[in-house]
């Protein structure tokens, strides 16, 4: 049965039973705009939208909640306050700000995220950053708006321009987004290599991607693109020693999480000409400091953590948590479970 059908399926006696309570934290006047409230109500849920961001108000509202739709900032304090919650759904891929997973497991709470909603958007943005860096789109556009045209007027607005055909892009991580980046890169006749110790060799072969160790990817690639979640083991995965392995004309791309890259080391590498440039949708501290040296460098493109944005994805990221909560509260397994070990403690079809 499809997830939408499962979510709307209720028993004949549901009306006589106490409706499960679903609390939505942070509706900010918009919850229900894309049908997410209807999804929950069709599943027999009573929906409470909490506009307050005050912790005392949140803790009071969620105490008797059966389900929760929340930002991906799940603290032990919040999870401790849940007396009978069965499911928490968040509208993000990354869950690096969740510190109450073990407690949720103990309490039998399923935590859901949306790992497959933004795949195409982030992959497309990665290629957009690559092309913007290679073609020097931002400084050239600005040069033109200021009255320049090409190299006339005595000012050269750009450095040399790569011809990307036949060059190599190296992917750090080979999950869903990275595989779509590989597919798109191959469309530009780029060679693709990737590092991911958790992915079987067959997945690389099937995608026509050369599997390699991290050091080899860094050494051999003209473009290095980061696609790993932020975990204790990936914090500053790309640091000073890794940047030192890269080619002097290489470009670093990051559409994953800012702290995966040691930002001071990256700034140093760019200032010293150790690498050619960078395309970043994320920074180590967000929002980015207006005085951050990265923002002053013509060989760096920075966008405001918006790689996942599109009209479709924006609506789907709001509907999906509702479907996931509805699925669990009607006894069905959700599509994406962040803490899969909890499934051993709960009974879901």
How would you describe each model-predicted region?
Residues 178-179:
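N-terminal Rossmann-fold NAD(P) dinucleotide-binding loop
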Residues 24, 169-171:
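Hydrophobic Val/Ile/Leu positions in short beta-strands of Rossmann-like dinucleotide-binding domains
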Residues 111-112, 240, 249-349:
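Rossmann-like dinucleotide-binding domain for NAD(H)/NADP(H)
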Residues 51, 91-92, 109-120, 196, ...:
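Short beta->alpha connector loops at strand-helix junctions that form conserved
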Residues 63, 80, 193, 197-293:
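Rossmann-like adenosine-cofactor binding region
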Residues 2-7, 11-112, 239, 349:
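An N-terminal-biased, well-structured beta-alpha scaffold segment characteristic
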């Amino acid at each position: 049965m499809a997830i939408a059908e499962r979510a709307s399926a209720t028993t004949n006696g549901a009306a006589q039973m106490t409706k499960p309570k679903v609390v939505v934290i942070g509706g900010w006047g918009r919850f229900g705009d894309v049908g997410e409230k209807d999804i929950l109500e069709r599943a027999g849920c009573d929906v409470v939208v909490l506009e307050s961001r005050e912790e005392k108000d949140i803790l009071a509202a969620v105490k008797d909640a059966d389900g929760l739709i929340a930002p991906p900032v799940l603290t032990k304090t919040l999870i401790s306050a849940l007396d009978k919650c069965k499911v928490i759904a968040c509208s993000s891929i990354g869950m690096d700000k969740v510190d109450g997973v073990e407690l949720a497991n103990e309490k039998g709470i399923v935590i859901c995220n949306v790992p497959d909603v933004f795949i195409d958007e982030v992959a497309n943005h990665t290629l957009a950053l690559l092309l913007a860096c290679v073609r020097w789109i931002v400084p050239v556009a600005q040069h033109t708006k200021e009255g320049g045209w090409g190299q006339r007027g005595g000012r050269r607005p750009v450095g040399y321009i790569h011809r990307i055909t036949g060059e190599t892009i190296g992917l750090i991580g080979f999950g869903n987004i990275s595989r779509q980046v590989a597919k798109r890169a191959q469309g530009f006749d780029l060679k693709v290599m990737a590092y991911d110790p958790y992915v079987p060799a067959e997945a690389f072969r099937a995608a026509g991607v050369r599997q390699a160790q991290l050091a080899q990817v860094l050494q051999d690639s003209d473009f290095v693109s980061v696609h790993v979640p932020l975990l204790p083991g990936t914090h500053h995965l790309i640091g000073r020693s890794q940047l030192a392995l890269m080619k002097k004309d290489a470009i670093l791309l990051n559409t994953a999480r800012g702290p995966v890259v040691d930002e001071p080391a990256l700034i140093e590498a760019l200032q010293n000409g150790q690498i050619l440039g960078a395309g970043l949708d994320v920074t180590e501290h967000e929002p980015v400091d207006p005085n951050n040296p990265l923002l002053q460098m013509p060989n760096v493109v920075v966008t405001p953590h918006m790689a996942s944005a599109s009209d479709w994805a924006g609506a789907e990221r709001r509907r999906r948590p509702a479907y996931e909560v509805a699925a669990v509260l009607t006894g069905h397994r959700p599509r994406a479970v962040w803490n899969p070990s909890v499934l051993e403690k709960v009974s879901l079809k």
